C-alpha cells in the first residue's frame, strides 16, 4: 500500500510541483492551487482511520510519502497535514477542515495570547495545530499575526487571547517537537537523495580538462561521502517511522533526526563544492534543496538537541550500556 501511495504521489508531483511552481509559491506565499491538487487526491487523509474516511495507514507506511515531500521540495504542508488530521480524528473531531495544517510548539503568554516561532510553512498553511506544555489547539492563520522567519515559507505566528479562545481546544496533548522531528527526518532523507542524484548527474555532465569531473579521484571521493550520508540518512528515517501507529517512538526519532541532520550539513557542503559557483545561483535548482536541508536540520532541534535526548534517555531512564540502548532502538521488531 505504501508503494502505491508513493507512486501515485510521485506522478502528481512530477506534473504539479515543478521547480518553477516551487519558486512561484516561495515568491507569492500562495500555495492554494497546489494544495487543492494534493488534497483532492486524498493523500492528506492517509493516516486517518478508514472508518473516518481516510486510508487507515500507519506511520511506517507513509514514510515514502513524507520523503517525497523532501525530494520534490513540496512548498505546502502535506506531511504535517497528514499527521494533524490523524490526531484530530483520534481526538474525535468531526468535520476536520479541508485546508492545510502545519504543526508547531507554542508558548502561552501571560495575557492569554499564544506565540509560535519558526512555524514550518506558516506563510502558506491554513491552520496550525499548536501544543504547549499542557494543551493543544487548532487555530486558523487567517487573522493571526504572521511575520517572516528565517526560511522563506516559515513564519512566526501570534494569536490574541480572543483568537485562542475562539479556536478548537483538544483534550489530548502531543509533543509537537517529536512529531516534527519524525517528519523532518523523512523529508531530509528525500531531499538528501535528490541532492546526491543531482550532484552525481552534474559531475558526469560537467567536462573539464577533457573529461567529466566525475572521473577525477577527488570528486569521486566527495561523491562517495555524499552517498554514504544520504543512504545512512534514509535508513535512519526508516527507523524514525518504524511505528504501527501514527505516533513515533521518541528514542527512534532522536536517532533518525540526529543522523539526518548530521548528513544535511555534510551533503549540502559537498554538493556546492562539486557544483562550484553555479550551485549558489537563484536560477539553478540546487539551492531549492540545500536551503531546505539547512532549514530542516534546525527545525525541531538540530543533531545536538537530539543527541541530548538520547543521552538523557540513557542516563535517566535506562540501565546498562549505551550499546543496549542502540540495540533496543534499532530492533524494529521489538
Language model: regions and residue ranges:
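Alpha-helical interface subdomain recognition
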Residues: 1-72, 181-334
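Generic hydrophobic, aliphatic-rich segments that mediate packing or membrane embedding
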Residues: 61-62, 80-84
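FAD-binding core of flavoproteins
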Residues: 73-79, 86-197, 323-334
Amino acid at each position: 500500500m505504501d508503494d502505491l501511495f508513493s507512486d501515485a504521489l510521485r506522478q502528481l508531483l512530477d506534473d504539479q510541483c515543478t521547480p518553477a511552481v516551487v519558486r512561484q509559491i516561495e515568491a507569492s506565499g500562495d500555495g492554494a492551487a497546489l494544495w487543492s491538487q494534493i488534497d483532492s487526491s486524498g493523500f492528506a487523509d492517509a493516516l486517518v482511520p478508514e472508518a473516518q474516511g481516510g486510508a487507515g495507514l500507519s506511520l511506517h507506511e507513509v514514510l515514502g510519502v513524507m520523503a517525497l515531500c523532501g525530494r520534490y521540495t513540496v512548498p505546502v504542508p502535506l506531511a504535517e497535514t497528514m499527521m494533524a488530521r490523524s490526531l484530530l480524528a483520534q481526538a474525535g473531531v468531526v468535520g476536520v477542515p479541508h485546508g492545510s495544517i502545519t504543526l508547531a510548539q507554542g508558548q502561552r503568554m501571560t495575557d492569554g495570547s499564544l506565540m509560535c516561532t519558526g512555524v514550518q510553512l506558516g506563510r502558506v498553511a491554513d491552520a496550525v495545530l499548536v501544543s504547549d506544555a499542557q494543551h493543544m489547539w487548532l487555530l486558523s492563520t487567517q487573522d493571526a499575526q504572521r511575520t517572516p522567519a528565517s526560511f522563506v515559507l516559515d513564519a512566526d505566528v501570534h494569536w490574541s487571547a480572543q483568537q485562542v479562545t475562539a479556536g478548537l481546544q483538544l483534550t489530548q496533548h502531543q509533543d509537537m517537537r517529536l512529531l516534527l522531528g519524525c517528519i523532518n527526518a523523512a523529508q531530509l532523507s528525500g531531499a538528501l537523495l535528490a541532492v546526491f542524484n543531482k550532484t552525481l548527474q552534474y559531475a558526469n555532465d560537467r567536462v573539464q580538462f577533457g573529461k567529466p569531473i566525475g572521473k577525477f579521484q577527488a570528486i569521486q571521493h566527495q561523491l562517495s561521502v555524499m552517498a554514504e550520508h544520504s543512504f545512512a540518512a534514509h535508513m535512519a528515517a526508516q527507523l524514525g517511522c518504524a511505528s504501527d501507529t501514527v505516533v513515533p517512538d521518541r528514542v527512534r526519532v532522536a536517532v533518525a533526526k540526529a543522523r539526518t541532520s548530521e548528513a544535511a550539513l555534510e551533503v549540502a557542503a559537498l554538493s556546492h563544492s562539486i557544483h562550484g559557483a553555479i550551485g549558489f545561483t537563484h536560477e539553478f535548482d540546487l539551492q531549492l534543496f540545500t536551503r531546505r536541508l539547512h532549514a530542516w536540520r534546525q527545525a525541531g532541534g538540530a543533531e545536538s538537541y537530539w543527541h541530548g535526548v538520547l543521552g538523557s534517555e540513557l542516563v535517566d531512564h535506562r540501565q546498562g550500556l549505551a550499546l543496549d540502548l542502540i540495540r533496543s532502538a534499532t530492533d524494529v521488531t521489538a
